[in-house]
Amino acid sequence: MKILSIHDLATIRKRAEHNLSLREESNEKVTEKCYGLASGARHLQILICGGTGCKASSSQGITDNLLKAIQKNEITDKVEVITVGCFGFCEKGPIVKIIPDNTFYTQVTPEDAEEIINEHIIGGRRIERLLYVDPKTEHTVSDSKHMDFYRKQLRIALRNCGFIDPENIEEYIAREGYFALADCLLNKQPTDVIDIIKRSGLRGRGGGGFPTGLKWEFANKQQSDVKYVVCNADEGDPGAFMDRSIMEGDPHSIVEAMCVCGYSIGSTKGLVYIRAEYPLAINRLKTAINQAREYGLLGDHILGTDFSFDIEIRYGAGAFVCGEETALIHSMEGKRGEPTLKPPFPAESGYLGKPTNVNNVETLANIPIILTKGADWFATIGTERSKGTKVFALAGKINNVGLIEVPMGTTLREVIYEIGGGIKGGKKFKAVQTGGPSGGCLTEKHLDTPIDFDNLLSAGSMMGSGGMIVMDEDDCMVSVARFYLDFTVEESCGKCTPCRIGNKRLLELLNKITEGKGTEKDLDTLATLGQVIKDTALCGLGQTSPNPVLSTLDNFYDEYMEHVRDKTCRAKQCKSLLTYTISPERCIGCHLCAKNCPADAISGLVRKPHVIAPDKCIKCGMCMARCKFNAILVC
C-alpha cells in the first residue's frame, strides 16, 4: 500500500507490532525457564542469523531443516522461523535464538535443526551442548543478556540487527521506522533537522570524525539546481564488517536516513556506493529500496508532500582508497579512484561537480533514532567531544570475537577483558591495534584509555572505521607493522609521491629488519620517513599509513632493537631470524621429520638423534609440525 500520511504509517505500525510483541517482551524480561509447546507455550519464534558469516556456515540449511521439521510435526500455526540480521557474536555462529525464553544456541548445524524442534520447541528442554560456554567460568549460559559479550554493549546503530527481518519493511515500521522521516517532512524545516543533528554531537563514523550536522549545514547552504546524497558503503579495512552487517540487518535505516539528509540539504537524489564483494548487503538494500518505493516512502511526493527523493546503487571494485570521499566520487563518475586536494570539499563540488554530502553507513544508521529520541538523549551518551556509541569489529587473540557496539568512553580494558572475555589460552596481552590498517598499536599502559576520537589520537592510534585487533605474546610487532604497511602499499592509488614511494621505502626497511639485515640507523630512517609521509601525503590513506610503524617504534622499540642488534625475534615469527635444532634427549630417531623436510636438511640414522643442517634449513616449520615428541626446538 502507498503511505500517504502519518495515519497510514501508524496503521501499519499497529498491524506489524503484533509480529514483534513476543520479541519485545522477551527482550525486557530475564528468565531461566525453557518454553516449549509441552510446557504451555502457545506461540514460539525461532530467529536465525542471516548475515554473511552465518550464511557461509549453512544457516540457510538450518532454516530449511527447521521448516521441514515444523511441517513434519504439524505445528506450523504455532512456530515461526524468521531470518534476522547479524547478532554480532560471529565466532559462535550460526546462531539460533528461541523466543520467548531467549535461549541462545551457538555453532548450530543443519543436522541440529530436528533436535531443536523435538527437544526445545515441542518438549521444552534446552539442548545443553548448543549453549554458549563462558570462557572464564566454563559454565553454560542460555540467555544472551547474561553473557559478558552483550552485557556492556549499547546497541544504537545495531538496534535492529538480530531483531527484525531485514526484508520486511513493516517490521522496521513497527520499530518506529520512517516516523523520523515523516516528522521531518510534516513538522520541521530543513534547518530544524540540521540543528538537531548538530546538537546531538554526532560525528562521522567512517574514520574522519567530522561533525555530521556541520557537514549537512555546508551542503544545505550551497546554491545549486542539483545536489546529491551519497552513502559511503565502501568498507575496505581488512576484517572490518560493521557497515556490511548494518546493511544486511537493517537496510531501511539507511534508506530513511538518506531521505532525511536529502530533505535537509535540498537533494532529490541518493547514491549508495558499495563494493561488489558484498552481494548479500546489495540484495538487502535493493529489497529495501524497492519496498520503500512500493510503500510511497521513496519516489515522488513522499507522504503526500512536495518532497521527492530516490536512491540508486553504484558498485565499487573494492579499492581501499575509494573509501576516501573524493576518490569515491571519482569512481562513481567512471574515473580512476584517486583522491583530490581539498578544498573544494564535496559539499561545494562533488559528484558531477554538484554539491554532495557523503556519510558512511554507521553514521546514517544513527540518524533516525536521534530524530526519534532527540538530540539531548543522544548527547548524554559518550564523552564530552565524542557522543553516542561506536561499532567495532573485535578480533584477534581474544576469546569472544565479533561485532560490538559500546558507548564512547568505554575503556579498552573493558572491551578486551569483559566484552572480549580476555586473551585466548590465558596468554599475556601484548597490544591492541585500532583503526584498521592505518591505525596504531597500543600497549598495556593504554588499556584504561577511554575510547573516543581524541583519546585514541593522543595515544598514537585512531578510531578509524572500527577495526580492533588484539595481539598476545606470540605476535611480533615488527612483523605486524610490516603486514599492515604491505596492505597500504598495495592499496595506494599512486597519485602522490610520499605515499607511492615513501611507503614502499618504509616497507623495504621493514623487510630488511625482519630478514635480519637491519641496522640501528634503519630505525632512525623509519621514524623520520614515517613522519614526512604523515605530513606530506595527499589523502587520509597516505597520511595515516605510517601509523603502525610509528606506534610500534614508540611502544615496542626494544623489539626493533632485538631484530637489528641481536638478530632475534622474541615472538618467533620472523623466519629469517629463527634457528631450528633437534633435542637429542627427546628425539627417538623415527625419521618422520627427515621424510617431510622439503629441503633435505635433516639427517640421522633410524633410532638415533637427528640433526638439522643450518645452511640447508629453509625454516618452513614442517619438521615441528610433523614431530610427535616435541623434539624440534626453535630459538
Language-model segments: residues:
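C-terminal accessory/binding modules appended to enzymatic or scaffolding proteins
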Residues: G388-N400, V406-M408, L412, R570-I618, ...
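Conserved phosphate/anionic-ligand binding catalytic regions in large, soluble enzymes, centered on
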Residues: G50-S58, I197-A219, G318-H330, R336, ...
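Short amphipathic, charge-patterned alpha-helical segments
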Residues: I70, A257-C259, G409-K424
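Iron-sulfur cluster-binding cysteine motifs and their immediate structural context
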Residues: K92-V96, P498-K504, L592-P609, M622-C635
